[in-house]
Amino acid sequence: MVKLTAELIEQAAQYTNAVRDRELDLRGYKIPVIENLGATLDQFDAIDFSDNEIRKLDGFPLLRRLKTLLVNNNRICRIGEGLDQALPCLTELILTNNSLVELGDLDPLASLKSLTYLSILRNPVTNKKHYRLYVIYKVPQVRVLDFQKVKLKERQEAEKMFKGKRGAQLAKDIARRSKTFNPGAGLPTDKKKGGPSPGDVEAIKNAIANASTLAEVERLKGLLQSGQIPGRERRSGPTDDGEEEMEEDTVTNGS
């Protein structure tokens, strides 16, 4: 594992990404802890922490400029409190393929008032009953969850399910948090799927080349790594078209 030092930050790749944001690439260093980001001098719109060994999402200084945080393919099982104080303008958070287990572990995301684009795909918590409705209720500012637009019908269903004393009790009952944090403990892993055919790989690469947002690029890369093909992956939310979120012209999900 590699300690995230000021020297590493200075040496890491820095570039203007596909959506013209200034990005810091800290991908694949096997970093275990987020620290020393004050060395960035708040000069980046996006930071890529993909493919590291991070277990807890915290340790950020005040980064007013940061809008996009990619933390897929880590080992995150906890989300720190008070992220809104450090990341007031965060709009996109990609937590795909981590180790979040309990619905209550997602509660700290509610404080991120600018968060509109969130992915928690391939975390054990997504298998919990009422997962999607719980996140929609607890983090109502999110407009796109797991790469699916939040529908007005879903918001109404979430409000109905969790409102009032009975709803509050239901939310409390299903939202327990992980009680222990053991750095050496084993974490859930997904079974490996068969790889895609060469034609499928080429289709995904073409889709990546035509992607219009950084989050979409990361989703397609994740599909390529897991052997899934765009349009064939299992949907984690409702499959009906439903009525889309009202006030669509106010949505700012990075596209």
UniProtKB/Swiss-Prot annotation:
Keyword Repeat listed: yes
Modified residues (N6-acetyllysine): K172
PANTHER family in the cross-refs: U2 SMALL NUCLEAR RIBONUCLEOPROTEIN A
Subunit structure: Identified in the spliceosome B complex. Identified in the spliceosome C complex. Found in a pre-mRNA splicing complex with SFRS4, SFRS5, SNRNP70, SNRPA1, SRRM1 and SRRM2. Found in a pre-mRNA exonic splicing enhancer (ESE) complex with SNRNP70, SNRPA1, SRRM1 and TRA2B. Contributes to the binding of stem loop IV of U2 snRNA with SNRPB2.
Annotated consequence of substituting N73K: No change in spliceosome assembly
SMART domains on file: LRRcap (SM00446)
GO-annotated cellular components: catalytic step 2 spliceosome; nuclear body; nuclear speck; nucleoplasm; nucleus; small nuclear ribonucleoprotein complex; spliceosomal complex; U2 snRNP
Family label: Belongs to the U2 small nuclear ribonucleoprotein A family.
Official protein name in the record: U2 small nuclear ribonucleoprotein A'
LRR repeats: 20-41, 43-64, 65-86, 89-110
Classification via SUPFAM superfamilies: L domain-like
Modified residues (Phosphoserine): S178, S197, S236, S255
Residues joined by cross-link Glycyl lysine isopeptide (Lys-Gly) (interchain with G-Cter in SUMO2): K172, K221
Single GO biological process annotation from the record: mRNA splicing, via spliceosome
Cited function: Involved in pre-mRNA splicing as component of the spliceosome. Associated with sn-RNP U2, where it contributes to the binding of stem loop IV of U2 snRNA.
Alphabetical list of Pfam families matching this protein: LRR_9
